[in-house]
């Protein structure tokens, strides 16, 4: 099954997440099919907090990809902004 979920990056105490499309059997930070955005939970006012490629997200969702709960919240947050 193909899923859209977060892969952690960054350093200790400075998390940074990539929004990726991957096979559900792959590890959290392992192999992925495509990177469709990012989420920076510790962004300040000058930095971008969330960026998602809506075209590619819609493409993968139409192909049957399942969206994780955390990514669904980010999509909802970006649509509201």
Curated annotation (Swiss-Prot):
Record-stated family: Belongs to the bacterial ribosomal protein bS16 family.
Pfam family, one: Ribosomal_S16
GO cellular component: cytoplasm; small ribosomal subunit
Keywords: Ribonucleoprotein, Ribosomal protein
Disulfide-bonded cysteines: none
Record carries keyword Ribosomal protein: yes
GO molecular function, one term: structural constituent of ribosome
Repeat found in the keyword field: no
HAMAP family on file: Ribosomal_bS16
Name of the protein described by the UniProt record: Small ribosomal subunit protein bS16
InterPro entries tied to this protein: Ribosomal_bS16 (IPR000307), Ribosomal_bS16_dom_sf (IPR023803)
GO BP terms: translation
């Amino acid at each position: 099954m193909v899923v859209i979920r977060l892969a952690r990056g960054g350093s200790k105490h400075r998390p940074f997440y990539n929004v990726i499309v991957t096979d559900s059997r792959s590890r959290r930070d392992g192999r992925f099919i495509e990177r469709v955005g990012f989420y920076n939970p510790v962004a300040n006012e000058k930095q971008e907090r969330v960026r998602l490629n809506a075209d590619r997200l819609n493409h993968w969702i139409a192909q049957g990809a399942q969206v994780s709960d955390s990514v669904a919240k980010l999509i909802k947050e970006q649509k509201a902004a």
